[in-house]
Amino acid sequence: MKIKNILMVTTVLILAACSDFLEPDSLSTFDTEYVYSNVDDARKGVNAIYSYFGQDAFRSRLSNNMAGNTDIEHQSGWSNSADRYQIWDLNALPSNKDLEIVWTFAYRAIRDANISIGGILKSSAFNSSDPAISKTMHHLLGEAYTLRAYWYSMLIFYFGDVPFITEAPKAGNDFFLPKEDRNVILAQVIQDMIDAEADMLWADQTPYGIEQVNREYTLGMIARLALQRGGYYLKPDLSMAREGDYQEYYQIAKDYSKKLIDLKDRPLPTDYRQVFMNECKFITPVNSDILFEVPFAIGNGDVGWNIGITVQGGTTALHDYGSGNNYMAIPPTYYFSFDTTDVRRDVTCALYKVNTSFQEEFIGVGASANATNIAQGKWSRHFLPAPPGKSTAKGTGINWPMLRYADVLLMYAEAENELNGPTGEAQGALRRVRQRAFPESYWATKVDEYINTVSAGKESFFNAIVNERAWEFGGEMIRKYELIRWGNYAQKMTETVDGLKKLADDAYNGTGTLPDYIYWKRDANGKFTVLNPNRKLIAAPDETWTRSSFLLDLHDNTLTYDEWITRDWAKYTNGTVRYIFPIPTVGIDNSKGVLKNDGYGFGGG
């Protein structure tokens, strides 16, 4: 039975009996000593932590919606006052329900992780004389530590300093904890994972492979959170800073990414598209690119509903794949940042949607075009192995990638460069990622010459890493966290807006070389084909091609530029980006006066 199915019937007794965060009146009465006395029940106890990935807090919020806006993914927050729009527009109030959901379920996940950690450490099975039992219990402990670290990482990215709870709820505990310094929290959860990882199992040793936290993922998370701890962050006075010990954490990131490379190296799959097609087809290979992906069961998960290629469905549609939207658009500046021979572009950026007749048709980038604009092309409900039904929408069961091996390679390259400059080791890690991105016939120029050029100095190599991560992970919604820790959030947003304006001006004035119009058709097999994705054409060679406005739609005859160009990133380009949000009202109220929204310009409420 796959873990995704187990999680659908998660330990109800444990969940039902446990208290909400900062609500001490309903402590768990379940016998944790019994639960963690044996491997099978301990597994169920740890499964309770996974269950929160199936809640909206992660399924549609943290995994994608709340990770905008960036230079490669965006939405028009100013166009609506609903909760998610407030977040995109960086003006969310403490009453925002999306913030409340994330806060509440993050602390519930942390609570259940603490229950598991405490129960496992006290269990006689943890130090059993049976090596198999002891090994499994040690692995479960590592899972719990790693899952707890993930939720604290997210809380810190969105709320800054937060209460740090490391014990299971029990009578006599102080439930009204003040904020803890984010650096203290990150240092501790990193150390927890460091202490646990050596006793964990590799994905190919676990029952559920990459659908279960494994040693590969924990090693990668040590590196990822070390870069977060060593990176820049927003302080309450709205300045960006990083700690004086940041190099120590870059060293940790280097050491633990290198440890994974040394102990469990694997070639990157040569077919970049197949990495994500596997998720849409419910294929979960171990020792491949994806180290851990959230295991959504059929009927759960929003991939292919609110992220991915738009599919127009419904009861009158001529297909049975249902309906899927794309909340986060890809700006054309990102599309045109790719080298035209980079295979990742046409996987990541979908210039088409699927209509009710189950035909692929062009979508544009302006106000007059389909509102979804360029979509994340890595996932779609019409890639599913079997149509889920005309009226289906959410619940595709497509897994969500949490960490890939390509990420580990690039984290290693980044950390090595920060500490020692663009050494041969740093170049080698970058080379492995770029080699997959280009046909081998282009390696001499697009890989070797390119890397030689960007390796001229530490800064140029860092900029190459910034770009490579954009091209490699587009649509996977991790860019926001990277821009934060790099301290270049506002810079990249400004570059995006300026770039969009230039595309609009060049198309309108006829001075550009990029496609003001796109010529497209469906080939004999019904496949969407674009004649001129990279250049302007005066006319199509024959009448089989349909002409649709493309970059011309960025220009507005009244406002000069489409309104979304000047407004989607308006609060991201005027000085430091205030990416921190207020603690939601429920957190303030339940703290009995301990917590306040002080700092960050919130006024202390």
Regions found by a protein language model. Give the residues of each.
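An aromatic- and glycine-enriched ligand-binding surface/loop that stacks and positions planar moieties
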Residues: 19-84, 160-162, 186, 194-199, ...
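Flexible, polar/acidic helix-loop-strand segments at domain edges
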Residues: 336-405, 597-605
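Bacterial Sec-dependent N-terminal signal peptides
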Residues: 1-28, 482-485
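Conserved, well-structured interaction surfaces
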Residues: 43-47, 51-57, 78-159, 174-187, ...
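Long, intrinsically disordered, low-complexity segments
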Residues: 18, 106-109, 188, 278-310, ...
